[in-house]
């Protein structure tokens, strides 16, 4: 199976740009910039994660802007990367900064992306999830149930994993009312 990798580089204008490269049968292919990422990016783009449901059918996520201001997702179908897009609906949740931190695909065109964002009420950090169904990304929503737990406004979602049957789980940490970090997991089915 071709296994993509993600990374970053500094271009001639001293801006961070993101790239992907695929390995197949022990040989690495040419690194490419995901289409559309340069148009989104005002500098400092980086990939956070990549996940493949099958060879040539992958998704990647990360952040772009100054400094890492907005989250993006991109999908590869049959070996061709589609255009990188801002995570749909994320701008409605965030007041300032957002980052897509992890993506996982259950099957081609069916993925989940998670991350965190600073909301407009005092810069508190919250968690979001966005789901891709049949190749179309839905709007990002706040992770259900996380808001009341996160009384001090410090969420970090580190990972999401989706099984082939379509069930996903995500985990991370939040800051409780005593200023202690606590772990959490959340699951989604269907």
Specify the residue positions occupied by each region the protein language model found.
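Residue-level hotspots at or immediately adjacent to binding/recognition sites across diverse folds
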Residues: 1-190
């Amino acid at each position: 199976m071709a296994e993509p990798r993600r990374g970053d580089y500094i271009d001639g204008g001293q801006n961070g740009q993101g790239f992907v490269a695929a390995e197949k049968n022990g040989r690495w292919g040419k690194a490419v910039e995901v289409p559309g990422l340069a148009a989104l990016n005002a500098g400092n783009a980086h990939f956070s994660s990549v996940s493949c449901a099958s060879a040539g059918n992958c998704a990647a996520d990360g952040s772009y802007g100054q400094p890492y201001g907005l989250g993006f997702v991109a999908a590869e179908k049959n070996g061709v990367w589609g255009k990188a897009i801002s995570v749909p609906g994320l701008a409605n949740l965030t007041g300032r900064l957002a980052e897509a931190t992890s993506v996982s695909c259950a099957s081609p065109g069916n993925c989940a992306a998670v991350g965190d964002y600073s909301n407009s009420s005092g810069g508190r950090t919250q968690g979001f999830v966005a789901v891709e169904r049949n190749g179309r990304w839905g709007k990002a929503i706040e992770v259900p149930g996380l808001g009341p737990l996160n009384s001090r406004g410090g969420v970090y979602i580190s990972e999401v994993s989706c099984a082939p049957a379509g069930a996903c789980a995500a985990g991370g940490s939040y800051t409780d009312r005593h200023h202690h970090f606590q772990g959490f997991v959340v699951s989604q089915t269907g």
